[in-house]
């Protein structure tokens, strides 16, 4: 005879890993080529001067300098640029 009643099953108990998205370097910080500035899904931020965009929309520095965030254009888009220090 069993001394414990059988436990029920559940369909819960799963969760996806966090993707660590977001801004990695902030305005005014010095940066070198290859450093990641923003990890994002889609284009929350657009690439400005001295910034490249990877296939997963990651923004990275192409030149050495200082990061500058700005809002411009008819649609108030947020751009990230690297300006000479």
From Swiss-Prot:
Signal peptide boundaries: none
Matches recorded under PROSITE patterns: RIBOSOMAL_L27
Single annotated GO MF: structural constituent of ribosome
Pfam families from the UniProt entry: Ribosomal_L27 (PF01016)
Protein name as annotated: Large ribosomal subunit protein bL27
NCBIfam families: L27
Organism expressing this protein natively: Pseudomonas fluorescens (strain SBW25)
Cellular compartments per GO CC: cytosolic large ribosomal subunit
Keywords: Ribonucleoprotein, Ribosomal protein
Originating gene: rpmA
Highest taxon above the source species: Bacteria
Family: Belongs to the bacterial ribosomal protein bL27 family.
Biological process per Gene Ontology, one example term: translation
InterPro entries: Ribosomal_bL27, Ribosomal_bL27_CS
